[in-house]
């Protein structure tokens, strides 16, 4: 059993951290996530100092079966597979 959390800029994930009692590991998401973060920061005018840094946060720790490496890899794969859905949620207008 390992704990994991997601480091994100606003609602865009960037990194998965996973840990057990002995060690912590991280899995950086692919460049397309950072490119999206950078594009949104520019769009919102949040590219300098505190405006950019204030967007960063971490989810609460959650638990999942597996070693820290297995958990970080699995959660990262799920986020990678959900990238297109994230884009649609973020950019498509909502009805109504």
Model regions and ranges:
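Acidic, low-complexity intrinsically disordered segments
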Residues: 48-96
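Acidic, aromatic-enriched beta-alpha/helix-loop junctions
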Residues: 21-58
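Short, charged/polar N-terminal "headpieces" of proteins
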Residues: 1-25
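Charged, low-complexity, helix-prone segments enriched in Lys/Glu/Asp/Gln
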Residues: 3, 32-44, 72, 79-82
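Residues in flexible loops and secondary-structure boundaries
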Residues: 15-17, 24, 41, 64, ...
